[in-house]
Regions:
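Walker A/P-loop
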Residues: 1-10
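Alpha-helix N-cap/helix-initiation motif
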Residues: 3-4, 24, 149, 153
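Hydrophobic residues on the short alpha-helix immediately C-terminal to a glycine-rich phosphate/catalytic loop
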Residues: 10-14, 38
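A generic secondary-structure signal for well-formed alpha-helical elements
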Residues: 15, 42-46, 168-171, 195
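Secondary-structure transition/capping motifs at alpha-helix termini
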Residues: 16-18, 45, 153, 164
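A substrate-engagement module of RecA-like helicase motors
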Residues: 19-133, 138-141, 184
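Signature of the SF2 helicase/ATPase Hel1-core->accessory helical subdomain module
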Residues: 33, 37, 115-132, 137-208
């Protein structure tokens, strides 16, 4: 935790001085957990900070099939109303003795399951209010996956790249088109779940 705490201390000072927010980009889930734990320790020392971790849509999804439409996913149906009615943002960032909770990916998933809302959409909404967002390289460096707050106002963010030596290979992958069988399978499953897209699913089935 020492190295991570040292990095966070310096970048938080810079962020507060310049009124910016922080995206902590990692290549591994294990490192995300270390950052979560470090921020929680800083919060317990009295630092007023809101942080959230995000994970990939397909890994976060609680539905049987990744199909983000209210007509085929009960977690997407009425999502925003349920989040507001159950005050999920406030609950996940609940203060105890003046210390703001730092919700883990599991905390977001559990709260989403209980409230029957989409955990991915919930984490994306939390990103808009967070001082620190912890997530994969993809959500800042991949133009097709960059999260809204960074895409809309890149100058308002400080980007911390953990294990930056891994970034060149990942970046080359962003610019190297490829179609994997798993992607085709995922597309087929998603389209098959939506009645109006069954015809498209049948076309994909021919090349599976």
């Amino acid at each position: 935790l020492g190295k991570t705490a040292g990095v966070l201390h310096g970048v938080l000072k810079a962020a507060y001085r310049s009124h910016r927010r922080i995206y902590f980009a990692t290549a591994r889930t294990t490192q995300q957990r270390i950052v979560e734990e470090t921020i929680q320790r800083l919060a317990k020392q009295g630092l007023p900070i809101k942080a959230v971790s995000i994970r990939a849509r397909d890994k976060a999804c609680l539905n049987e099939v990744v199909a983000c439409r209210p007509d085929c996913c009960r977690f997407a149906h009425g999502h925003h109303d349920k989040v507001r009615q159950q005050q999920l943002h406030e609950r996940l960032w609940q203060e105890t003795d003046g210390v703001i909770r730092v919700p883990s990916m599991e905390d977001v998933s559990e709260a989403s399951s209980d409230a029957v809302v989409c955990p991915f959409a919930l984490s994306m909404a939390l990103c808009r209010e967070a001082d620190v967002v912890i997530g994969d390289y993809n959500y800042v460096f991949d133009p097709t996956r960059r999260i809204g707050p960074i895409a809309e106002s890149p100058g308002e963010w400080i980007i911390v790249v953990d294990e930056a030596h891994n970034l060149p290979d990942r970046a080359r992958g962003y610019a190297s088109p490829a179609l994997h069988r798993s992607t085709v399978e995922e597309a087929w499953m998603g389209l098959s779940a939506v009645p109006s897209y069954v015809g498209c699913a049948d076309l994909i089935a021919e090349v599976r």
